[in-house]
Regions:
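Non-heme di-metal
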Residues: 2-492
Length: 492
């Protein structure tokens, strides 16, 4: 037995981070300002492995690329019908399909962050072909993913703001499966010369309008969470004039005169890359509220076990003793519930534990993020959390019981209208008070880029400089946004 233990320990000791978590490690390696040569080499091998994983998968693409437009329109029509059925069921009183609570929705936002924060990355390598009309459509898609340089339209900027406004920025500890899609997209970004058909195919799949996007947008708004990042994709991915149409055009424009069948086979393989790793529905389906609360408190216990005094005893132990071993967290929660510190399935305001977290003199103020507080709140509230259904259960007397928490939370759009009404009389003098043309520390980076661009000897050199600043790691920065605006003007 001892020999086996030593052998296992020795083997684990020599495993590299890439071997343990290949997708996560590659993801962050490729998000460096200038990815190292070994990271780029690993990216190519990683794509080969992921493409091999798609070979047994069935594909719904037509065998002939000439049938793609009909396929796309039929798919869009089916999604539309399913969404209308969803809306009808909700109107009839059905609960939300995806998010049982606000914490569930925030769990989802956090879980898909590695993918959303590299939105559009797979097309980056095609920018090098800006003067080749065969690639006009995918380059236009990339520019639109970047908001054409406008921060309020740049998809990564929007998602960063969405995470920050909901206390969900701490996502880098997610499991390796959560990084697969992001790693694929970044690997494609730096290997366009070797995987062009696969990029075209991946783009075709990614830009189709999925049912989950429509439902997600609807339910986020219902829960008071800004759905704009998702509704923006609903509009730009349309099959009429949007990214879905451009993605289809990209297939036809890139199709070679010879070896069309071989090219299209690779397009189909790239299309299937969309099916790998954790996706929207799998992340949503993996939510376990109680387990998330247990994991959260176990993580906090690593510091918490040192900072609590010993005068408060729960279940015969002080708090530090409970927190000394993360495995004791489930029993600790049971003890707090048994002694009245936590009152499940009641308004959390009735629980002493919750008042320690949130209140006028909350002793644990600042310990938990907004997302973590929402997890604890919804777990304590239990059956009182509103699922969106008109009636969710019967009480002991057989009468309908309606969830009351929150008390029919305002949708995000309703909150937005209230804020706009409050601000109508308030003038914004910031722009008028600013000195026009004055460079300060906030815009020095953008000013430096303009100077570098002015020194470039040719248009080609200028475009190359801009492309460097439009990488997945840079495009959402101040200089990256400026580079995108300038590139967009020159390209169009």
């Amino acid at each position: 037995m001892q020999t086996t233990t030593r052998a296992t320990t020795s083997r684990q000791a020599v495993l590299t981070p890439y071997a343990l978590e290949p997708s996560r490690h590659l993801y962050f390696s490729l998000l460096e300002q200038k990815p190292a040569a070994d990271a780029l080499e690993k990216a190519r091998h990683y794509l080969d492995e992921q493409l091999s994983a798609t070979r047994p998968m069935p594909s719904d693409l037509p065998e002939d690329p000439q049938g793609l437009e009909r396929w796309m329109l039929q798919s869009t029509e089916q999604v539309g019908q399913e969404y209308r059925a969803y809306l009808k069921s909700r109107k009839a009183g059905a609960p939300r399909r995806y998010f049982t609570s606000k914490s569930h929705a925030l769990y989802f936002l956090r879980g898909v962050a590695p993918t959303k924060l590299v939105d559009g990355a797979w097309l980056y390598g095609i920018l090098q072909r800006w003067n080749d009309t065969r690639f006009t459509a995918p380059i236009q898609i990339y520019l639109e993913e970047l908001g054409e340089g406008l921060p309020d339209k740049n998809h990564v900027v929007l998602y960063k703001k969405l995470l920050a406004s909901n206390g969900c920025e701490d996502w880098d500890g997610l499991s390796d499966d959560h990084y697969v899609q992001g790693a694929i997209q970044l690997a494609l970004a730096y290997n366009a010369e070797h995987f062009l058909p696969e990029i075209i195919g991946f783009n075709l799949g990614y830009e189709q309008l999925p049912l989950h996007l429509l439902i997600t947008s609807y339910e986020l708004n219902e829960l008071g969470i800004d759905p704009y990042y998702f509704t923006l994709h609903v509009t730009v991915d349309n099959a009429g004039t949007g990214h879905a149409k451009k993605a289809l055009q990209a297939v036809h424009d890139a199709m070679p005169v010879e070896d069309r069948e071989a090219f299209y086979r690779r397009v189909a393989q790239g299309y299937l890359l969309n099916n790998l790793g954790a996706g929207t529905t799998s992340v949503i389906g993996s939510f376990d509220l109680e387990q998330e609360v247990i994991s959260l408190l176990a993580e906090k216990s690593t510091v918490g076990k040192y900072v609590h005094s010993d005068y408060c005893r729960i279940g015969g132990r002080n708090v530090s003793e409970w927190l000394a071993d993360p495995a004791q967290i489930p029993a600790f929660l049971e003890a707090m519930e048994a002694q009245g510190w936590i009152k499940r399935h009641e308004d959390p305001q009735n629980s002493r534990f919750w008042k320690l977290i949130q209140g006028e003199r909350a002793e644990m103020f600042g310990v938990f993020t907004a997302y973590e507080q929402q997890l604890i709140h919804d777990w304590i509230a239990g059956d009182l959390v509103h699922t969106g259904a008109k009636v969710i259960a019967k009480d002991q007397a057989g009468q309908d019981r309606v969830a009351i928490l929150p008390k029919r939370e305002l949708s995000f759009r309703a909150k937005q209208r209230q804020q706009e009404a409050l601000c109508q009389s308030a003038g914004d003098n910031a722009a008028s008070n600013a000195s026009i043309g004055e460079v300060n520390d906030f815009d020095s980076e953008a000013a430096a880029l303009e100077q570098r661009l002015a020194c470039q000897p040719t248009r080609e050199a200028g475009m190359a400089l801009l492309i460097e600043m439009m990488s997945p790691a840079n495009h959402h920065t101040a200089s990256g946004l400026l580079a995108t605006r300038l590139f967009n003007k020159l390209f169009n």
